[in-house]
Structures are given as structure tokens and as C-alpha cells.
């Protein structure tokens, strides 16, 4: 048994080994990703106690594990070894022993990578290993050297596998199978093998030069010795961008076969799909510097790489629309698989649009001189100061670590688990009045389905209060996916216009729903004392408060029992020293705040009240009579 798995030259056995390694690496990489996400879930240090080096080491480990030890071994080594010989009618690959060596080099690389994280403080260089952060001055120990050796070993493994797949495809096809008759998955592995063969030597050269700089006193990337660290970036991204297609083209091949299976017909335009994959692979070598816009490329260089990148959308579009041309059968048992394919196609369409917008950045940087809010109108002013920011950095932030420059998305990631306190106070005031949290717009979901989905926050206001609704929307814009919409509501037979917005369905709102709801009934949370402040009271008044003649205030809180209203009233008395009583109006109880309490409350909440909502106060009367506004 041991001999079979250690010395096997059978392509299927080796494919199983690739899958096992990929699963192990995927679990380790996912664990690192969870630690990273938990650390970023809220501002400040959460679990790593401010150890930024450890955070960087986790980023390096996660990236290298996922790219070189999960996706590439699974898609190329696993599916390629298992399916390619079967699809071309070969008994095995052309070089079975090289195939075995190609796999067993990978675990050695994994050992080097794990060792690099344990030596001294680890390799905290970021997954791109840019100098001078990866130079001997920043990382004097052997951790970066071990990480470079790990990359070398994965490169050797991929090169051996690529040579094996190319020779197998060219020389071991069954009789009568010409190149034009090859299945699309075989073509995808064949094209990917050429990409590996052409790009990996460049990466190996770059990291070897870095290794020499670190250990043999050369100056390839050392500025003080006449070197240029930008050279490393060019070498890395000449490999890095084809690597994107190395990862996705085998997926293209798999999706093509799945689409063909469920449509029960060949993929539309099979030959054009092959040429599209080849074009994507070729153009992938001509666009690497779109990852480097921020390093100071001249205008002509940026214009070339922008144009070349946009051209890649043409062969990608051919593939997308060829998949869309295949209608699916009416087999009801395959709905989940159809949804999977449709979602994959939607994802590709979104990526195409993102690529198009991303590559207009050069035009925006050269021609646009306006405010940042006009570029990102939904960016939160609490996170970005428009007059003190480098617009080029924000626009080209897509190309750094896919996090800078996307304020909407990064804010969602930050607050998926917990809502920041300043927003939580506001939402508490709104949820006690007109706001509510629901599961979905569909009413036919069973209980099991409801438990598996996240919740969203909703708010409706009449057109009179549209400015207030837009103000709340701007505060929560990084949770939202669309702008507020106008709807026609009917109350007691009368129609009137109102505005409504709702957020994305996120875990943070699910947690809020568990606090404020019991089933479908809104309740008062037990920890309401900690969730209220003066800003919460201001939003309670703006949402559903009304002043009466004489200076008193009614809080028309929604859907609460008498006991819950008494509980809220006691909190207002204890925490804010407000004298409140219960009044019954139209068979409903409301909280009435006496005029003396309103006098004390008004200066505290005045700064939170919007100008359009001050009609609820007689401002001139309060200024003149009580002299409470500075």
C-alpha cells in the first residue's frame, strides 16, 4: 500500500495525491484567512495584540498556500492527471516517472513554506515579496530565503507537469483524434501548460536575483548599489498576470463540459472557444504593468497597458456568450447545478465590467480634477477625508492588494460581524421607531430556509422626511447595494408617496434581529440601557416623535407592549434623568416626556437634529424663551 502511493506512476493515483495535498493546503489556508478576517472585523487590534509582522506572515502563508498548493495542484495536477489521459484515449501520461517527481517536489516546498513561518519572526513580505521589504535589511533571518526556496520547488513541480502535459497531448492521442477534435478541457490544460512554461522561468529568475541580493552582496534590486526594485516588480508581474489565467483557464474548460452536459448538446462555437482561450493566454503576457500603475509609469506606457487590458475583454466575452447560447434542458433534478453555472456566468460578467472600469483609471487620473465624492459618491465621509487624499492612490488601489480604493466593499468586510458603536446607537433609535429588520422580500420561505439566510435593515419615510431618510442612507451606504426607491403606500384608502431603502443581507443584521425580535414580533432588547445615547434619542424623535403645544414630547414607539414601554421609560429616567409618563391615545400607549425634561434634553440633541426636521421644534420659541442655543 505504501509503495503504491509513494512510487506510483499511475496518473490517477497521482491525481488523487494532488487532491489530498490540495485539500490539506486549502484547510490550512482557510484557517489563516479566518484569522485575517477576524483581525479585520473591527478597528484596532483584535486577536494578534498589535503584532503586524505576524499578520503579514499570515497573509504570505494564506496567499502562497491558496495559489501554489490548492488551486494549481487541484485544477492542473488533480483534474489534469485524472481526465486528460482519459479524454485523449491514452493509457497514461508521456513521462510517468516525471509525473511522480512533479508531485513529490510539492510537499518539500510545503515544508519549506511552513518552516519559513516558524524561523525567527517569519516572512512578512506580503505575497508579492517586493524588495526592499524582502531585502536583507528588513528580513535578516533565513525566513525569506526558505519562502523563496518554496517558490522554487513549486515552480519546478509546475514546469515538470507542464512538459508532461504538452508531450502527452501532442504525442499520445488516440487514432483519428486531431487537435481540432480535442475536448475543451484538454485544450485548457494544454494552453495552461504553455503559460506555465513561459511565465515560471521569469518568476524563478526574479526570486533568484533577490536571493543573490540577500546572500551574495549583488545589487540587482538594491538602490544603493545601482539596482532598481521596480525591475523586480516587472519580473514578478510578468509571471503574476499569466498566473491569473493559469488558475482560471482550467476552470473555463471544466465549466464548458458542465454546460455541455446540462444542455445536452456541444458547446456553442467550440473552435472559437479554443481560439478565445489561446488569445486570453497570449494577451495575458502583454498586460502585466496594469498591476503597476502607481509606481510612476509614464503616460504612454499607461495608455498602452490600459488599451491592451481592455482588449482581453473580447475573447473573454466570446466565451461568456458562447456559454449563454446553450439553453438548458427541463430536467427538474438539476436545478442546483444550473444555478451554479448561472452564478459562474454572472461572476464572469461582473469581472469583465470591473476590468473595463478599472482600466479607465488612467483616463480618470489624467483628466479628472474634481472631488473624490464625485468618483466614489457613496464613500463614507467618516473614513475618507476628500481634501486630504491622493486620488490616484484610491483609483489605482485595485492593483495593490485588492482592498485600498474600494471603500464600499472594504467597509462591508469590516462590519460584516459587528456594527461600530456610532452606527449601532443610531440604528437602535431607528429600530425603536420606524425601522425594521426582515429576512427577505419573499413570503414563501419555510423555517429551515429562513434560519440559513442573513437579514437586512429597512426604513421607510414619507416624502416630507426624505432628507432624513437620505441622511440615514448615507450613514449606512457601505451596507447598501442600491439607492432609495420611491413607492406608493396606501393608508386608510388614501395613497401617498414614500421613500424606502434596504441594506444588503449581512450577518451583523442577523445578530441585530435576534436582539430586537422574537420570531416576527419586535421586542425591546434586554441590554437597551447600553444601546441608547443622545444620538439615539435624536433619531427616535426624528423618526416618530412629535411635540405638542406647551413643549411636551410624544415618543410614538412602534409595536411594543405596555410592559416594554414602561421598561423604556424607566431607562430614560435612570440614564438621561428624563421625567416620562405613559399617555393613552387612540387605544395605544405612548411615552410622554414632560416639558422640563425636554428643556434639559434639547441642548444635548440639537446638534444631531437635521435642519429639515427642526419643524418639530419651535426653534425661535425655544431660543427666545429658554435661551438654550449658543
From Swiss-Prot:
GO MF, one annotated term: cytochrome-c oxidase activity
Organism: Saccharomyces cerevisiae (strain ATCC 204508 / S288c) (Baker's yeast)
pH-activity relationship: Optimum pH is 9.5.
Keyword Ribonucleoprotein: no
Region (COX1 intron aI5_alpha encoded): 325-630
Assembly mode: Heterodimer of a 32 kDa catalytic subunit and a larger 60 kDa polypeptide subunit.
Listed GO CC annotations: mitochondrion; respiratory chain complex IV
Residues spanning the membrane: 16-36, 57-77, 101-121, 147-167, 182-202, 235-255, 267-287, 305-325, 417-437, 464-483
GO biological process, one term: mRNA processing
Region (COX1 exons encoded): 1-324
Major subcellular location class: mitochondrion
PTM: The mature protein may arise from proteolytic cleavage of an in-frame translation of some COX1 exons plus the intron containing the aI5_alpha open reading frame.
InterPro entries assigned: Cyt_c_oxase-like_su1_dom, Cyt_c_oxase-like_su1_sf, Cyt_C_Oxase_1, Cyt_c_Oxase_su1_BS, Homing_endonucl, LAGLIDADG_dom
Assigned keywords, A-Z: Endonuclease, Hydrolase, Intron homing, Membrane, Mitochondrion, mRNA processing, mRNA splicing, Nuclease, Transmembrane, Transmembrane helix
Membrane topology, as annotated: Multi-pass membrane protein
Role of this protein: Mitochondrial DNA endonuclease involved in intron homing. It introduces a specific double-strand break in the DNA of the COX1 gene and thus mediates the insertion of an intron, containing its own coding sequence (group I intron), into an intronless gene. Recognizes with limited specificity and cleaves the sequence 5'-ATCTTCTCTTGATTAGCCCTGATCTACGG-3' after the nucleotide sequence ATTA leaving a four-base overhang and a 3'-OH.
Cofactors, names only: Mg(2+)
PANTHER family per UniProt: CYTOCHROME C OXIDASE SUBUNIT 1 (PTHR10422:SF18)
Primary gene name: AI5_ALPHA
EC numbers, comma separated: 3.1.-.-
Disulfide bonds: none
Location(s) in or outside the cell: Mitochondrion; Membrane
Pfam family, one: LAGLIDADG_2
Name recorded for this polypeptide: Intron-encoded DNA endonuclease aI5 alpha
First-level EC class: hydrolase
Family: In the N-terminal section; belongs to the heme-copper respiratory oxidase family.
